[in-house]
C-alpha cells in the first residue's frame, strides 16, 4: 500500500519544541527509507513542510509510522492513497 502524505507546519505554533521536532525529521525519514517504508521525501519549496511517499503493508502500519513522526502534533496532513497505473489487461 502506498500513500502520499503532504504535511505543512503551522508557523503560528513555532516554538523550541517544534524546532527540535523539525530537527529530528531527517533522521526519522532516513531510517524509514532504509527500512523501505518511505520511498521518497521532498521539501516544499517556499512552504514549511514536505511530501513523503510511504510504502507499507497495512493501513495500521501507515498510521503507526505517521503517528511517530516527530512533527506529528505540529503539522497538518493531507493523505492520498496511491495505486499503480498499470495498463488494462484482458
Where are these regions (language model features)?
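Conserved, structured core segments of small domains
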Residues: 1-90
